[in-house]
Design a protein with these regions (language model features):
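N-terminal intrinsically disordered, acidic low-complexity segments at the extreme N-terminus
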Residues: 1-37
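Primarily the internal scaffold of c-type cytochrome electron-transfer domains
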Residues: 4, 71-80, 84-87, 102-170, ...
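Short, low-complexity patches enriched in S/T/P/G
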Residues: 36-50
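Hydrophobic membrane-insertion alpha-helices, especially the h-region
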Residues: 50-63
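Hydrophobic single-pass membrane-insertion segments
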Residues: 60-74
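Long, basic N-terminal domains or extensions that often function
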Residues: 200-201, 232-238
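Exposed beta-sheet edge/beta-hairpin loop segments within beta-rich domains
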Residues: 224-226
């Protein structure tokens, strides 16, 4: 019995090979049912079609992008379509820093950046530790109170009074202090701080008119019109200044976009340039803006592609490209580096300075006979009548505009263009072995103020 039972069990248990064979044998009708059970979006034909569409679209977009870059695709400007651009507005120097890091770092160390600041422990250089200064019988005192800075001096009525210092003006070689009055006037104190090192005669209080007694009723007194910041100084020490003088109320409501001389003081309102830069980063070619000015009010690119070639015979340089009729850079710098009077507030960077200001011409007492500066005329007038200007030299050939310093120190700035073997020799300077060394500027740009 046991033997038969074992035989029966063996007969009904399928072998592994047979089981595998039967599992592989799927009837045709059951295969169709399985195919129909796969969702259509997972089917091979659909996936193949989708892949083809992606490839075609990628190729089309890439082709359009390449076509646009190569200049073949008509962008909106070419079709006469005016792009929507933001209104011109000031955005502040910090908006420029992300893209222009090198220029920003130089500017932050410049006098432009420190042309005007809020009075604080970080910005005030003068001695306000109960220091005093005497001037024609007026005993002025400089002190601090509640973290604010004060000066006790003669006021508009000639009587001693304490005035809070609201702003600082400049850093080197002197610093002045501004005091705000209730009617919106901001006045520049005539007692200034000599910020030079002590061994150079600095670190002291001094009066701007040491040899004249300026009384309270004198137009030059610090409380009068000639020392008024709103009228005399604001345009060049701050950015985007609106004087907002109320003639009926004889008050000022002056404001600015930036307290010191920022990027937009020279480059103009920056909103459209920021918009242009954002569009240039777009992957879609139609977003790119082909504005030749890059959204700027003025494009200060006069030195691009320009070289100075020195004539070996004379040692003098020649400009590789003739200068433009209007030197946008010179006119822009001239706004603050000229002796002039303002008659209109609609000047923008790059425009002729004479469109909005009366520039002091050659006048007796202002210039030396050879055209060099004699009085406080700054640089514009003297430079525009020079041979250098006529030859095509512009401000940034010698000055790095963001650092506001010479591109090379000493005679090196002149030797960028003038051959050393012709000019840095005793036969030219007529000063062999002189100590201290006589520089080019000693004769050609002497300092008198």
């Amino acid at each position: 019995m046991a033997r038969g039972k074992n035989r029966s069990s063996k007969r009904h248990t399928p072998s592994k090979r047979a089981a595998a064979s039967r599992a592989a044998e799927v009837p045709a009708d059951r295969g169709s049912d399985l195919a129909r059970s796969i969702p259509w979006w997972k089917s091979k034909p659909y996936l193949a079609a989708l892949a083809a569409i992606v490839v075609i679209a990628t190729g089309l977009i890439g082709g359009l992008a390449l076509f646009a870059v190569e200049g073949g695709l008509p962008l909106p400007e070419a079709l006469g379509i005016e792009r929507a651009r933001p209104a011109l507005a000031f955005v502040g120097s910090e908006a420029c820093a992300n893209c222009h890091q090198t220029e920003t770092a130089l500017w932050k160390q410049s006098q432009h950046k420190h042309a005007m600041q809020h009075a604080s422990a970080a910005s005030v250089l003068g001695d306000f530790n109960d220091a005093s200064f005497d001037y024609y019988g007026v005993h002025s005192r400089f002190f601090k109170k509640d973290n604010n800075f004060f000066v006790e001096t003669d006021g508009p009525d000639g009587k001693l009074a304490a005035f809070q210092v609201k702003y600082t003006f400049g850093i080197d070689p002197l610093q002045q202090y501004l005091i705000e009055f209730p009617d919106g006037r901001i006045q520049a104190l005539s007692i200034a701080w000599d910020s030079r090192p002590k061994d150079q005669g600095g670190q002291r209080w001094f009066h701007l008119y040491p040899d004249e007694e300026i009384k309270h009723d004198d137009p030059l007194h610090w409380t009068k019109l000639n020392q008024n910041w709103n009228f005399m100084c604001a345009e060049c020490h701050s950015t985007g200044v609106q004087k907002n003088y109320d003639a009926a109320g004889d008050r000022f409501h002056t404001n600015w976009s930036e307290i010191s001389v920022g990027c937009e003081a020279c480059h103009g309102k920056g909103s459209r340039h920021v918009h242009w830069a954002d569009r240039q980063r777009s992957w879609w070619p139609f977003d790119r803006d082909e504005d030749p000015l890059r959204g700027l009010t003025v494009f200060l690119n006069e030195r691009e592609g320009v070289t100075w070639q020195v004539d070996p015979k004379t040692g003098n340089p020649l400009r590789s490209v003739a200068p433009a009729a209007i030197r946008r850079e010179v006119e822009t710098c001239g706004l603050c580096h000229a002796r002039r009077g303002q008659f209109s507030e609609d000047w923008t960077p790059g425009r002729w300075l004479s469109d909005s200001h009366v520039v002091s011409p050659l006048a007796r007492g202002l210039y030396h006979a050879d055209g060099q500066m004699r009085d406080e005329v700054y640089n514009y007038g003297s430079f525009k009548q020079s041979r250098m200007f006529a030859a095509g030299v512009t401000c940034s050939d010698c000055h790095e505009p963001h650092a506001a310093k010479h591109r090379v120190e000493g005679d090196g700035v002149c030797l960028q263009c003038h051959a050393a073997d012709k000019y840095e020799v005793a036969s030219h300077s007529q000063h062999e072995g002189v100590t201290p060394k006589v520089t080019c500027a000693s004769c050609h740009m002497p300092v008198s103020t």
